[in-house]
Amino acid sequence: MDSLNQTRVTEFVFLGLTDNRVLEMLFFMAFSAIYMLTLSGNILIIIATVFTPSLHTPMYFFLSNLSFIDICHSSVTVPKMLEGLLLERKTISFDNCITQLFFLHLFACAEIFLLIIVAYDRYVAICTPLHYPNVMNMRVCIQLVFALWLGGTVHSLGQTFLTIRLPYCGPNIIDSYFCDVPLVIKLACTDTYLTGILIVTNSGTISLSCFLAVVTSYMVILVSLRKHSAEGRQKALSTCSAHFMVVALFFGPCIFIYTRPDTSFSIDKVVSVFYTVVTPLLNPFIYTLRNEEVKSAMKQLRQRQVFFTKSYT
């Protein structure tokens, strides 16, 4: 409580992506379009999964949860970034900064755990297909999703606690477009080396260990594909390569940023764009929208809408 009582900073000022007004307007238009595509693409997947019985499978249950997480994850940072691109002075209150930081880590950690679950789902489906219905039943799926949200909440509470326990009484300039633990604790009026080590132990270890676990699972899948038919091999390779692309795009920036205590590079802002803006956009296209089952479901939904419209005209 003493640390909190010593807090003097009431707001933080973002430097944003650039100080060039022309570039800011271009970025605003580009990121606005990306955000709209992110929302629409992920919402379409959720709707298709809910209203199409053929998609009521564990994999699409997890992917619809991924779409929900991507909507939330991008909504934590992108709207504030767009506001900053329009305004000359880019500020955020201390409380809102901590709130943004909490939800950023909640949704990011939930996505990390969900990507592990998706990898495990593919491992069971491809390597032990006969046991798949028993291993990945709906009860297990719901328990896994509950566990990932619980794990994400615990992680985020830990990161938030490490941040707010420090006194902030001096500089308030954040060289980014959003609040994150490594960026905020550098502004604390005390030595943060130990806190930085704890952050690496928390975020860095989670990112790196989970990435290695996912890579290992896909390597096991690739080895087991030798036992499958050529058609089955091709389908599994297509699915796994798409999944691994998302894993690399998301885990790469996280590992780059969260495994370095007390160090930062000018490229960090660009790297952050990948996992806060780009990955939530690409996930629906890489995972599902190019999938024939999802395309068929989308077509059925359009036909239902056409029938609904015609019946009232």
UniProtKB/Swiss-Prot annotation:
Predominant localisation class: membrane
Residue spans, topological domain Cytoplasmic: 50-57, 121-139, 220-235, 290-313
TM ranges: 26-49, 58-79, 101-120, 140-158, 196-219, 236-258, 270-289
A GO cellular component entry from the record: membrane
Listed Pfam families: 7tm_4 (PF13853)
Positions annotated as glycosylated: 5
GO biological process annotation, one example: detection of chemical stimulus involved in sensory perception of smell
Family note: Belongs to the G-protein coupled receptor 1 family.
Name of the featured protein: Olfactory receptor 4E2
Native species: Homo sapiens
